[in-house]
């Protein structure tokens, strides 16, 4: 589903320089972009939003966005981003329910490289490739995946509260953990 905002600025831009400036201005407020979704008759769909992921990479030939629980690992071309003509920016939009939350990362393919997601028939190798992507530098909401890579987090207005998630400031204010080491070398967290 196309982003109404991105469609408008692409169509209104006089040249590539103006388009790049407008995109830079828009992403300064953070990404992904969240927009109202509408029904075909023009009335607002209060239960869904258009979520547009933007990623800047000047030399990439392709960019795959891996969105946890959304990207179809059997049909990865559906998650290939499109380059915005005349820019270094890539985009892909989805229409999602307002209670949606997901982590995501970007996997660029450079000139002459084979996309790391191609030809991997075994699920473990494919999943490792998808987990190795880059986080969203324009999104302050992050989570680390199972291999320790930071991924962006998108959460819409009605997403359930995650009481166990802490901000970096809250993490920094936690006391240092205390460990007990047994004679045989095992460690146990105290408290």
Place the predicted regions along the sequence by residue.
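Extracellular Ig-like/FN3 beta-sandwich strand-entry sites
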Residues: 99-103
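Acidic/His metal-coordination segments adjacent to aromatic residues that form catalytic metal sites
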Residues: 106
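Non-catalytic, glycine-rich low-complexity segments
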Residues: 1-55
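A short loop-to-beta-strand scaffold at the N-terminal edge of the catalytic core in hydrolase folds
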Residues: 183-191
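Aromatic-rich carbohydrate-binding modules that target alpha-glucans
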Residues: 45-47, 52-98, 109-182
């Amino acid at each position: 589903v196309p982003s109404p905002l991105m469609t408008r600025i692409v169509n209104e831009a006089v040249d590539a320089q103006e388009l790049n400036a407008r995109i830079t201005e828009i992403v300064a407020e953070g990404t992904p972009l969240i927009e109202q979704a509408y029904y075909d008759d023009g009335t607002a769909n209060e239960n869904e939003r258009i979520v547009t992921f933007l990623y800047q990479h000047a030399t990439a030939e392709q960019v795959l966005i891996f969105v946890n629980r959304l990207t179809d690992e059997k049909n990865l071309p559906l998650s290939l981003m499109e380059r915005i003509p005349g820019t270094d920016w890539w985009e892909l939009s989805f229409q999602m329910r307002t209670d949606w939350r997901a982590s995501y990362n970007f996997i660029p393919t450079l000139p002459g490289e084979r996309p790391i997601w191609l030809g991997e028939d075994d699920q473990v190798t494919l999943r490792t490739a998808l987990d190795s992507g880059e986080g969203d530098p324009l999104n302050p909401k992050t989570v680390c995946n199972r291999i320790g890579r930071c991924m962006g987090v998108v959460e819409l207005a009605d997403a359930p509260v995650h009481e166990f998630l802490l901000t970096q400031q809250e993490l920094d204010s936690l006391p240092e953990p205390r460990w007990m080491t047994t004679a045989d070398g095992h460690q146990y967290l105290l408290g």
